[in-house]
Amino acid sequence: MKILVVNCGSSSLKYQLIDITSEEALAKGLVERIGIEGSILTQKVNGEKYIIEEPMKDHKKAIELVLKALVDKEHGVISDMSEIAAVGHRVVHGGEKYASSVLIDDEVMKALEDCVKLAPLHNPPNIIGINACRELMPKTPMVAVFDTAFHQTLPDYAYMYPLPYELYEQNGIRKYGFHGTSHRYVSSVASEMMEKDLKDLKVITCHLGNGASLCAVKEGKSVETSMGFTPLAGLAMGTRCGDIDPAILLFMERELKMSPDEVDTVINKKSGVLGISGVSSDFRDIEGAAEEGNKRAKLALDVYHYTVRQTIGAYTAVLNGVDAIVFTAGLGENSAASREEILNGLEYLGIKIDAEKNKQRGKQIEISTEDSKVKVFVIPTDEELMIARDTKEITVK
């Protein structure tokens, strides 16, 4: 059974065709510059690249070319579109309505439209991608898998902001959390590596990429997470500020005469480690600059590591202990130095790291020592596989 997994951005589209029986990705692809000059599709099959360069005025045209690439006689992996049993779509925001993945119908599409106000940057391209697929593949079942769904198990005292209650009731202002599919995947893999039931474990998962969030998992459920109403909250990130005093925004508007759009650009695109370092939002560049003596680059890393360490400490209190800590995503999987710095200062938890094992990059591995009281894992995330699994579960009766 083959499942197409689609992740639509505003001008890009990532996809994978997964054989769900073997859980193997048969093809992976990226479409860039949709609706912009220089549109390009790059597909990889067994390490071989296949490139299509032609104008793509919209996502429908992009999906057409994806399907064309998948069935291409020379470079494709299927002989006919009918081999695609179902399509799984990554959707950033499901609001309070969806605590799990769902089969897409007209009612679901309306609910996704209603969530646009909660995710104005992300949900519209997700919806456009779904509509394009439904138009081109009308008989193929489609499933929406939400970034927010895993966190719908947060208790009310964890998701409620101390604001007038009407803002929650009337406008849906509360903590939602994101990266849920990733947190769900790596926590389940950690339990497999420990040969224990996830329901018996307390796990802290650290999704550390350009966007970053932590999640506290208890009895297999998310009970706390660092992102909030939007993906801006929580940790310092590549270009996002994370948690700051909200009055700073008022100061920027009133005293610095910045418009709301200008403030938005600063806190979303010019802050985080980029803002502090003045070097880059890429941690590899910042680590390089810090090694060469750039003090602001070192400070940016120190702030970042501190916010992650601080949050891990808080989540051990939320969970009343911790059995495992998991690192995933770009930085979490590949930066031994960052993992070491983050865990440095958490020795009171009984954490001991094997320095040699910690040098591994991008591999699934336990990096704690045998006598460490808390297990520490590096687990490459696989959100696409999780989306494919959910899609199979919902469409195969």
Curated annotation (Swiss-Prot):
GO molecular function, one term: magnesium ion binding
Active site: D147
Pathway(s) this gene product operates in, as recorded in its UniProt entry: Metabolic intermediate biosynthesis; acetyl-CoA biosynthesis; acetyl-CoA from acetate: step 1/2
Localization terms from the record: Cytoplasm
Domain of life assignment: Bacteria
Residues forming coiled coils: none
GO cellular component, one term: cytoplasm
Annotated residues for binding of ATP: K14, H207, L208, G209, N210, G211, D282, F283, R284, G330, L331, G332, E333, N334
Record field: catalytic activity: acetate + ATP = acetyl phosphate + ADP
A Pfam family recorded for this sequence: Acetate_kinase
Residues bound to substrate: R90
Cofactor(s) listed: Mg(2+); Mn(2+)
Binding site for Mg(2+): N7, E383
Enzyme Commission number(s) from the entry: 2.7.2.1
Entry's cofactor comment: Mg(2+). Can also accept Mn(2+).
Residues annotated as site: Transition state stabilizer: H179, R240
Keyword terms of this UniProt record: ATP-binding, Cytoplasm, Kinase, Magnesium, Metal-binding, Nucleotide-binding, Transferase
Biological processes annotated in GO: acetate metabolic process; acetyl-CoA biosynthetic process
Function text: Catalyzes the formation of acetyl phosphate from acetate and ATP. Can also catalyze the reverse reaction.
Complexes and interactors: Homodimer.
Similarity section: Belongs to the acetokinase family.
UniProt protein name: Acetate kinase
Organism phylogeny: Bacteria, Bacillati, Bacillota, Clostridia, Eubacteriales
